[in-house]
Amino acid sequence: MIRFVKDVFQALWKTVNFLRRACVNLVFLVILGLMLGTAAFLFHTPEVPEGAILVVSLEGSVVESGASAAKRVSLTRLMAGTTEQTQLRDVIDAIDRAAKDKRISGLLMRLDDLQSIGMASIHEIGLAMDRYKATGRRITVWSGGFSQRQYAVAAHASDVYLHPMGQVLLTGIGSSRLYWGELLKKAGVTVHVFKAGAYKTFPEAYVRSGPSAESLKADHAWMDDAWAQIQDSIQMARGLLPGAVSGVIESLPKLLKDSGGDLSAVALKANLVDGLKTRDEVNNLLLERQGGKKGDLPKTIDYRDYLAALTETDTVGKYVAVVTLEGEIRDGESGVSGVGDRTMASDIRTVRQDPNAAALVLRVNSPGGSAVASEMIRRELELVREAGKPVIVSMGDYAASGGYWVSLAADKIVADPVTVTGSIGVFGMMPTFEKSLEKLSVGTGGVSTTWLAKARDATQPMDPRFE
């Protein structure tokens, strides 16, 4: 009897053990299959269909830096999401390559997901679109609605189509900021400002109740110039008369009244768009141009897949190195929103020590940042020149303050016509809260061996020797 029970339990255990192993192996095979399938999808080299339309989607923020589309694995696209950034070089490279590629019959620009783009980036993409149009092929843009910056790109297309319920939102340029000076005074906060340069106006928000004359003058200077550039670019690309864009803005209330409040009709009447179409109507138009059958979808290829499909040759022998400096300049290592002096210095040093690097192009797109970090980077560029290698700075949307400082080490500086550049000084700020504590009946006290030991104590008045 005991032996029988033992045999039963052994049989059950073998069955359970078999099922356990089978389940583990099945899970392993499923995971392995998913991994192999994912790898095959991600690393598969796309093919370029004959007569395809190249789809160029500007998504999120247009930036300078990032991995090349032809080399990166886009997990975001695999998950059917949208990318948060678009690399400027990828867009321009794809458009320029398509201009020389007879397999590409046209371009379709998608701008709905474009959130942020600088003036210089708009200008450079516009120039690339103009070069493509010079081949005699068409660029089509369709959107449910255009913001001002989206439209500044779209205006360079051959055909601009808008959804019948959409709008083209041209507003001009404006800015405003809050001034906390009076509030901080009432709260007993004393803000000590140290600066060099009349136009270094950032600290004004903490010590004044409104902008200074210098601040207004500086803002007017760059805004008026930028707005003139936007208007000229749109008017030239669309074949409009000078002043047409401003005319639409100034007469908008009347135009809206005449059109019964229909913003898309206003855009069409002002020749800002070539027609009002739904997405499917635009697809049918593209299909007709390709000679496709009704009901089919037009042959297209995404610009990232297009770049991945093109064969790249490895660099052999001498080459020109390109290093990108983008974002706020800070001490230490580079991060998501800024560039660190250690990271940049290492990249530049690598170029200097590489015997095959014949020259260095530094692409600058930075509003500035730490003075010390900027000097560290500038010195590394200077060492490249001392090593006998030419250094060229190419300025993007911004190259101000520290961004301009590092550029001074170059043999030559090239800026876009709409680059915001210049050096307007430096500043430092330190708030002290002795009056705030007094209002709250909070006392402070202590000792120090020297007057500098408590120099950073924000609960004490600033020593007059610092003023």
Model-assigned labels for residue ranges:
Residues 1-256, 261, 283, 287-392, ...:
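Small-residue-centered hinge/linker elements
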Residues 274-277:
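A structural motif shared across PLP-dependent enzymes of the aminotransferase-like
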Residues 280:
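Extracellular glycan-binding segments that recognize GlcNAc-based cell-wall polysaccharides
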